[in-house]
Every structure is written in C-alpha cells, then in structure tokens.
C-alpha cells in the first residue's frame, strides 16, 4: 500500500510539474517557420522567433520551448514593423488610437513631420482649437514633449515619434506673418529647438511650400538645423519647390545639410507637373553627387502619382500672410481676388510653388471639408465644381476656401508612373504616407482621405514588388525598416535581432496589397495577418486588438534616458552613413 501511495505521489508530482510548465511557457510569443526578412537587406532565412516581454528573445531554426501564443508562419513573410517615415496621425490618433489604416499595412512606427504639435503659445493653442475640423479635442499641452506624453497616457496602438517643426518654432516667436527674425529672436528659436530635442524630438522638420514656413530664408534654417545636429537629430523637409525650380530647391536642402552638419531627408521625392517629368535624372544626380561628397542626403516617397494637401498650395504666399483668417479676409476683397485668380493661372510662378498649375482643374480632386454643407462636393474635381457653380475654376477654389473656412483638403494629380517606378528602386529611398492614420468608421467617414492613407505600404509590396518587380522583397523590407531606423538613429528598432524591440509583422507576400481607391478610400489593405508592437498583439489574425501597445519613441538627446542631452557639435555623435 505504501508503494502504491508513493507511486501515486510521484505521478501526481510529474503531472503537476507539467501543468506548471504549461501555465508558464518560456516565451510570450513564438513565430514558427516563417521566411524571415530581418530588415538588413540580406537574404531571408526560415527560422523561428521567440518574444519575451517587449523584446525579441531568440531567433533560430526549430526553437525549443513553447510560447503562450504561437503563430504558424509557414509560407508567410516575417519582418520588422514598417516605419512610416512621414506620417500625419497627430489628430487621428486622438480620435482613435488604433491607427487601423496603417496598422493593417504593417506600420508599427508613425513619424510625424513637416510641423509638430508643440511647442505652443496660448495663442497657438487657441487657434489650433478654433481651426479644428471634424475631430474636436481640447489642446491640453504646450510643450513638444507634452503632446507625446498625452498620446501615451491616452493609449495608442502604434509607436509614435516626431520631429520639431521649424515652422512651429517660427510661429511661436514671430506669429504667422511674413517677417524675418532678429538675432535675439533667432537665438530664442534655437533655444526652443534645443528644448524640444531634449524632450525627445528626432530632429528638425519643415514644409517650405506652405505659409508661414515659406517665409523662412536659408540662413534661418541652417541656424535651426545646426541645433538639431548638435542634439543628434536630422533635418527633414518638404522642399521649397517640386516643379520648375526643383533643382534650386534640392540644392537648398544640400546646402542646409552641408552648412549645419545635420543629415537631411527630402520628403515625398517627386517631379511635379508634366513639363518637369524629365528632370528625374538630374534630381537623382544631385543627390548622388552630394552623397559622394559625404553630405548625408536621403529621401522618402509615397507610391501614388497624386499628392494630397490643400488649396493653399494653389494660391500665392502673399495672400496667406498672417494665417488662415487673414487669408480668407483678403480673398473677400475684389482686388485681391482678381490678383489671386490671375496668379493661379500662371503655371510657372517665380516666387511660389503652384501645384494647381501642375495639376489643372481637372486634376484637382476635392477630398475634405470642414463645412457640412460642402461635404457633398467630396470626390468631385475642381473643374466639376466650377461647372456646377458656373464660374471659373480659380474662382471656385477661392469660394471653397471662403465658404469652408479652411484650406480644403485636395489631391493634385501631377506625377509620372514611369518616374515613380524608378524612384522606388533608389537605394537611398524610404517610404511615407504623408497622411493621417484613420479607421473606416465614425468621424473618419465624413471626409475622403487620399487612398495612400490605407494603401501606401501595401501598394509598394503588392504592385511594385510582386507585380512589377521594380525591387525585391528583401530590399523593400530593408527600406521600410532597417534603413529608416538607421537614418533616424533609433536604438533597438528596425531589425529582427535578439534584444531588439519586438515590432514584428507577419504577412502573405502573395496577397498583400491595397484596396483603397479615390472613390472608395476607406478600405483597409489585405495580406497582413499579425502585427506585434513592443511584444504585444496590435493586429491578430487580421483583426485589430485595440490594445495600447504603442509608445512614444524619442530621439537620442532625450534627457529622460541615460546619455541624453545635446552635445557641443554634430561631430560628437555617431551618424548612419
């Protein structure tokens, strides 16, 4: 009887041990048998990936040990999470923290650029709330870092990083008027850039075709970019011109990088307007020449032949001097209206970048309105609205701005598909949607985004990799992950390596692609099955979990981390080649 009892006790102990082992597997997630593209650009391998906490724990063939969650990735591609190098989810993530349009494409890091959500003066906060569109929210922060803190506290699925806007800093000190800073004001602007860098900015950013940013001269930008470089950051910029004065605009970016010591990224690399499509070779040669001289220049792009912005890009900068309210007031004056109308009809102005001139009324598609009475015009071209209102397209554009009380969201069809196919293959090119991160429900259905909001990255993989063979999958993954991560000096992100953050995408390379169109833009992409962000599921079996997996990803001068703080010069930092 004693022997039986002892045997029973031993058996019970073994069973209990097995149950404990089953309850506490060594890993949180194991991804098994996938074709792994590690983000470095090297050839893929078939291995398992184990995740523990927010980090990758192990990568090897046939890993022993189970995960609390197991993903069978046989026949699937596994890669680092994609980096949206130019994103505008500033407001959309406040309304819905999932960012589903990008999440469904495998984006795990949204990088805010062109402007920033801080630092703000009380007047800037007031105007920001006054100018809000469909999404209403209180502006509760004032500092650059305060906005990132707010997002983290609210809860978001994607990681979010941000540059500090040169235009934001300019408005902080100078307002929205066409004025130049005094030496004391410029020093104060530099101080705001330094403060933002130490609060986590990745660098300095600008959009030089828009007012009031366009009022800044090159020396001002060099002075601000120098602070970014001293703080380990880069300079990202929508160039001052993308059509007739493209060469001069690219040269300005090169000059700023060379003089400041800050690496520069050219936003949405393009040649706008049919007459400029032949300039691609010259533009590429300028970048390659600068890089050969060890001036660090890179670029990013979206994968569509139309851009999306506002009707402010169709009108001269002088009429916009002082901000939106003064712009609208000037448009109501008959003399100003006539002058604007005449200047809009000049496709080759010398002092501003006329996107309307490159697209024409038929190539200007209306996407987003603030005024509910104008929303039925969504999806129509400017030419169609002009016909309905029985006036010229230029007058229609002016009236739209006045009636809507906003810049009005539009798409401009200006680029060449042949050029785009060459651009995606450039080795120094990464990718950005230049859009918000909406979700196809609720308030987001009140307007039409550009389809790139839902399709930019899936289109790269489906159309330009699988269908056209313009670049290989391993190269595309590298330039969605490891390449931009290195350019941004991100620590522990962009590659699949033990010890790195577990931002991981599992997708089907045979089916991944976009579904969004200009007429039906609110359609999520297909082919991405699972997305881990910081080791937790943000997308599982194609469905958003709603989990708050995201964090603020801050630059290397952030004083909240060991070794933070700005340096005496750019030479005190290590830079990506």
Predicted regions and their residues:
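Active-site neighborhoods of metal-dependent hydrolases
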Residues: 148-151, 156-159, 163-183, 187-210, ...
């Amino acid at each position: 009887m004693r022997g039986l009892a002892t045997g029973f006790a031993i058996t019970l102990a073994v069973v209990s041990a097995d149950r404990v082992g089953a309850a506490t597997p060594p890993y949180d997630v194991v991804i098994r048998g996938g074709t792994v593209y590690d983000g470095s650009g090297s050839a893929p391998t078939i291995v398992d990936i184990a995740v523990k906490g927010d980090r990758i724990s192990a990568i090897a063939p046939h890993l022993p040990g189970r995960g609390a969650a197991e993903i069978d990735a046989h026949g699937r591609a596994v890669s680092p999470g994609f980096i949206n190098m130019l994103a505008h989810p500033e407001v959309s993530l406040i309304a819905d923290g999932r960012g589903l349009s990008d999440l469904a494409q495998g984006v795990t890091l949204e990088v805010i650029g062109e402007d920033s959500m801080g630092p703000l003066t009380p007047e800037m906060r007031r105007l920001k709330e006054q100018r809000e569109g469909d999404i209403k929210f209180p502006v509760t922060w004032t500092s650059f870092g305060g906005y990132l803190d707010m997002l983290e506290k609210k809860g978001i699925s994607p990681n979010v990083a941000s540059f500090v806007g040169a235009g934001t800093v300019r408005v902080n000190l100078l307002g929205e008027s066409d004025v130049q800073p005094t030496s004391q004001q410029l020093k104060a602007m530099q101080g705001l850039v330094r403060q933002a860098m130490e609060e986590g900015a990745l660098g300095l950013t600008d959009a030089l075709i828009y007012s009031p940013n366009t009022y800044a001269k090159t020396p001002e930008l060099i002075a601000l970019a120098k602070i970014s470089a001293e703080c380990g950051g880069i300079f990202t910029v929508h160039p001052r011109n993308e059509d007739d004065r493209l060469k001069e605009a690219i040269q300005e970016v090169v000059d700023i990088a060379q003089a400041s010591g800050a690496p520069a990224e050219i936003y949405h690399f393009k040649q706008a307007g049919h007459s400029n499509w032949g300039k691609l070779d010259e533009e590429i040669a300028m970048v390659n020449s600068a890089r050969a001289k060890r001036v660090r220049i890179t670029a990013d792009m979206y994968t569509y032949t139309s851009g999306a912005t506002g009707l402010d890009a169709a009108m001269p900068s002088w009429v916009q001097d002082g901000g939106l309210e003064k712009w609208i007031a000037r448009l109501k004056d008959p003399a100003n209206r006539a002058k604007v109308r005449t200047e809009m009809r000049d496709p080759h102005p010398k002092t501003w970048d006329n996107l309307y001139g490159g697209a024409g009324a038929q190539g200007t598609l209306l996407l987003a309105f603030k005024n509910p009475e104008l929303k039925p015009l969504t999806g129509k071209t400017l030419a169609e609205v002009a016909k309905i209102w029985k006036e010229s397209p230029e007058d229609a554009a002016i009236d739209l701005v006045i009636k809507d009380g906003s810049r009005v969201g539009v798409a401009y069809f200006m680029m060449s598909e042949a050029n785009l196919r060459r651009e995606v293959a450039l080795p120094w090119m990464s990718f950005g949607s230049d859009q918000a991160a909406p979700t196809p429900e609720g308030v987001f259905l009140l307007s039409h985004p550009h389809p790139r909001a839902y399709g930019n990255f899936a289109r790269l993989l489906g159309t330009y990799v699988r269908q056209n063979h313009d670049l290989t999958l391993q190269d595309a993954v590298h330039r969605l992950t490891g390449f931009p991560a290195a350019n941004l000096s991100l620590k522990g992100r962009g590659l699949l390596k033990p010890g790195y953050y577990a931002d991981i995408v599992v997708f089907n390379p045979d089916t991944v692609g976009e579904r969004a169109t200009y007429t039906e833009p609110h359609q999520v992409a297909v082919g991405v099955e699972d997305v881990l962000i910081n080791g937790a599921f943000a997308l599982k079996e194609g469905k958003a979990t709603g989990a708050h997996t995201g964090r603020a990803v801050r630059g290397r001068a952030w004083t909240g981390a060991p070794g933070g703080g700005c340096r005496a010069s750019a030479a005190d930092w290590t830079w990506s080649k």
